[in-house]
């Protein structure tokens, strides 16, 4: 987020800098005029106060009532403004450490009766916790995992339907919550998260939701040995991954193929290895996969997908 006040300070600082001639690098630093220093400190303090007050005001709006559609609209607007402010990691940390905004946002997943509020809250959570270990930890403390899983399952307070956008944003937030964190990934698995993902992988599932779920599955099995082992214990999930890997949808096929490649890397043992995967493959799977490879060969932009499909064929034949 570009801060107008910060940009003004930068322009003012440049205007106060003597750039007309070269300075001796060994010369002592130029001492800022006391009046200029006082001005700069005053503006910087004002900037911090203004940003902090704005963040706290947004959190108060997020915590406000939503008995009417108008109140719900005000809350969505506050959540969207927080999203605009939290697009940088320092602001994301400050959203909770300074304004204590993460907990009430997480609570909306459970308490709100408006789908647009829940969806926007999930979007904000995903942004705040992504690549942000302190916020990931705070989100776990605020029970983000069970509440996001419940939203993804369609378990909401008003008992009404949960739309595709809500589910997509819940899955995206779950992905951000557990990424790069083995303990979080294990908690996700223990909470039944893999079974929840499997429900969205059928070919008749909404396309955007299926693609997002396959992306999350791909990331999870690439990072987590426990997730790879858990996948190999679920024949239904393996069959769905294989079916998606030869589907017409290029994005879904790419993510599913990458997931299967990761599963093929599980170390083999007396009764381990990828035997469960082989058993779960649809009839004529290798033939279908090779047919997809033939299509990829004609696409100059599909080199990565072609390489993954080729690696999968080699791994299955070697097994």
Task: Pin down the residues of each PLM region.
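Short, hydrophobic/charged alpha-helical patches characteristic of ARM/HEAT alpha-solenoid repeats
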Residues: 46-50, 92-98, 135-142, 184-191, ...
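Register-specific detector for alpha-helical tandem repeat solenoids, activating on a conserved position
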Residues: 83, 93, 106-107, 123-126, ...
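Alpha-helical solenoid repeats of the armadillo/HEAT superfamily
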Residues: 2-39, 66-83, 113-129, 141, ...
């Amino acid at each position: 987020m570009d801060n107008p006040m910060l940009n003004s300070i930068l322009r003012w600082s440049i205007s106060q800098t003597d750039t007309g001639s070269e300075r001796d690098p060994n010369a002592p630093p130029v001492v800022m005029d006391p009046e200029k220093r006082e001005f700069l400190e005053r503006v910087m303090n004002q900037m911090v106060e203004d940003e902090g007050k704005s963040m706290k005001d947004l959190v108060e709006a997020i915590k406000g009532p939503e008995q009417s559609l108008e109140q719900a609209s005000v809350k969505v607007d506050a959540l969207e403004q927080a999203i605009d402010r939290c697009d940088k990691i320092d602001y994301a940390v400050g959203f909770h450490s300074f304004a204590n905004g993460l907990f009430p946002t997480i609570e909306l997943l459970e308490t709100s009766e408006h789908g647009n509020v829940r969806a926007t809250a999930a979007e904000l959570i995903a942004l705040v916790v992504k690549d942000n270990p302190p916020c990931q930890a705070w989100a776990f403390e605020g029970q983000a995992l069970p509440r996001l899983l419940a939203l993804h399952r369609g378990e909401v307070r008003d008992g009404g339907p949960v739309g595709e956008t809500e589910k997509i944003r819940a899955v995206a937030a779950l992905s951000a919550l557990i990424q790069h964190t083995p303990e979080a990934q294990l908690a996700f698995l223990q909470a039944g998260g893999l079974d929840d993902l499997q429900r969205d992988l059928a070919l008749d599932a909404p396309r955007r939701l299926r693609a997002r779920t396959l992306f999350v599955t791909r990331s999870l099995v690439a990072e987590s040995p426990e997730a790879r082992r858990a996948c190999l214990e679920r024949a239904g999930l393996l069959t769905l991954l294989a079916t998606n890997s030869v589907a017409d949808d290029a994005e879904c096929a790419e993510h599913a193929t990458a997931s299967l490649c990761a599963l093929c890397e599980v170390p083999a043992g007396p009764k381990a290895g990828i035997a469960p995967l082989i058993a779960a493959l649809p009839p004529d799977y290798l033939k279908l996969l090779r047919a997809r490879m033939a299509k990829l060969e004609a696409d100059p932009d599909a080199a990565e997908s072609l390489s993954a499909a080729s690696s999968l064929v080699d791994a299955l034949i070697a097994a």
